[in-house]
A protein has these predicted regions:
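Active-site His/Glu-centered metal-binding helix of metallohydrolases
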Residues: 122, 126, 130
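Hydrophobic alpha-helical transmembrane segments
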Residues: 1-118, 131-280
Length: 280
């Protein structure tokens, strides 16, 4: 509990101190420092890079390399995963991290600037490090996990709704760029349907928000049983397998991530603009 509180607190103090010094020296310098900080907080580029490595391994290097690549981005055991399991793991990670890697940082940067983004990332990192539900970390990491649930509660729901909208944009774009106007890999209708029905099918109150929207958008089934630290963990299926998962869905989930991130950036900029105009 102490670690989960002290880490975000120290992170916030250090970040604010750097910004105060920067803005005190020069307003432009302060803006540059805060802009660099905000860029570093967002995980879009690193997420895309990792998922491309998984896709490339599946396409060019074989299943074992794909397992190794996906092991770098998931907490589950990957040694026994087949191709479907590797793709599912990658897509699920994109879906979940759309919320805690992109939407939530933007949300807290909108409210509190770069300091808010860094404090949020510290909370999220503590959950990733010690928030596991196993015998070793169950009690030690419980507070970190609960704190992460609290700070992600609103952003996760914003992310889920925006991903549904993103499904519609992706569906329209795909139809405009293909000869087949009747079939699409995306479906805004199914995204909304699965988001409403499956967004609570997870032990975490937040994890299935964007995952359900992504599963519905791609018309595939996600989640289900996985092995963690050698033990089988049963999880409910999220989504309906209207079509089977394929390697291309890794890229499609990334497209949903980028559109969702873009929509959130627009919302953040509009809100901050309204606030600036209101306080003048």
């Amino acid at each position: 509990m102490v670690l989960a509180i002290l880490t975000p607190l120290i992170t916030g103090i250090v970040t604010v101190s750097i910004l105060v010094v920067g803005y005190h020296i020069n307003m432009i310098l302060g803006c540059v420092i805060e802009t660099i900080m905000c860029y570093q907080i967002l995980a879009v580029k690193s997420l895309q890079s990792r998922k491309y490595e998984v896709y490339y391994a599946l396409d060019k290097e074989g299943l074992q390399q794909a397992r190794n690549a996906v092991a770098m981005i998931v907490g589950r055991d990957t040694k026994q995963l087949d191709e479907h399991g590797v793709v599912r793991a990658a897509v699920e990670t994109v879906a979940e991290n759309t919320s805690d890697g992109v939407i939530a940082p933007l949300f807290y940067m909108m409210l509190f600037g770069a300091a808010g983004g860094f404090v949020y990332k510290a909370v999220n990192t503590m959950d990733s490090m010690i928030g596991y539900k196993n015998d070793k970390y169950l009690y030690f990491g419980r507070f970190a996990a609960k704190l992460d649930d609290v700070v992600n509660f609103i952003p996760a729901r914003i992310g889920g709704c925006l991903m549904v909208v993103s499904a519609g944009i992706a569906q329209l774009a795909e139809k405009c760029n293909t000869k087949d106007k009747t079939n699409s890999h995306y479906s805004i209708g199914n995204a909304w349907k699965i988001f409403k029905s499956d967004r609570k099918k997870h032990s975490s109150p937040n994890a299935a928000q964007t995952e359900s929207a992504c599963a519905g958008a791609l018309k595939v089934a996600l989640s289900g049983d996985n092995y963690y630290f050698g033990k089988l963990v049963h999880k409910p299926q999220i989504g309906e397998a209207i079509r089977p998962l394929e390697a291309g869905d890794i890229g499609r989930s990334n497209i949903l991530l980028y559109i969702t991130a873009f929509l959130m950036v627009i919302i953040v900029l509009l809100i901050r603009l309204i606030i600036m105009l209101a306080v003048r």
